[in-house]
Each structure stands twice: as C-alpha cells, then as structure tokens.
C-alpha cells in the first residue's frame, strides 16, 4: 500500500501528446486507427510505438515488452496521459516489471477499461 497521499496529475489539453499503449489484449487495427484519428480530431497528438500491434496468443505481445512501452510513456515528461488501446486479459503480467518509485515521481493520468483492474488497482494503491 501507498503511505503517501495520492498525487494529482495535470489535466490534459488540446495539443498535448498522449501515449497509447497495449497493456493487455490485442485489438483490431481498424478500430485502433479510428480511435487515434478521433484523438487527433479532438486536438491531441497521440503517440505509440510499433510494438502496440504485437500479438502473442491472447495478449498484445510479451509482458516485458508491454511493460517497457508503458514505462517509456510514463517516464516521458512531455506526456501527461496514457491511454490503454484495449482492456482484456493480461495486464496483471506487467506488474513485476513496473517501477513504483519512478512512476510516483511523475504522476500521469491513465485511462483504461474492462479487465485492466490489476493495473488500475496497482496504480491507485502504489503510485
């Protein structure tokens, strides 16, 4: 559990860079591209690495690679928010690879749904 009070990340504004990561299940590329297009239409600058399209059975790539992508986005001071491309099974696999201390030093908004519960719980209680 976290001993310190929760940190409030900054609000996002049009023009901000937003990272899109795939911490859990893979997704249809067309739906992803439509979502990225909508973020652009709203004035944001979505960013993602090519690994977001990886697939390994029922998850979006190797756990260590998904965690590296999340940590890279989290540690980028120019990115105020991170969006999960999709929920689904697999987010719990990232937890051993995440750095609480590093994440706590740079509060971010993290947006996700469905079965990102393990990751959202980790961020809420530890970061």
Q: What do these predicted regions represent?
A:
Residues 1-78:
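ATP/NTP phosphate-donor binding region
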């Amino acid at each position: 559990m976290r001993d310190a009070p929760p940190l409030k990340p900054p609000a996002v504004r049009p023009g901000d860079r937003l990272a899109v990561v795939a911490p859990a299940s893979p997704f249809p590329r067309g739906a992803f591209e439509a979502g990225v297009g909508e973020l652009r239409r709203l004035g944001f600058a979505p960013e993602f690495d090519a690994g977001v399209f990886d697939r390994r059975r029922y998850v979006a790539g190797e756990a260590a690679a998904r965690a590296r992508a999340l940590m890279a986005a989290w540690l980028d001071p120019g990115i105020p928010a991170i969006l999960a491309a999709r929920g689904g099974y697999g987010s719990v696999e990232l937890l051993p690879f995440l750095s609480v201390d590093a994440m706590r030093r740079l509060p971010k908004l993290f947006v996700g749904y469905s079965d990102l519960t393990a990751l959202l719980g980790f961020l809420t209680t530890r970061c």
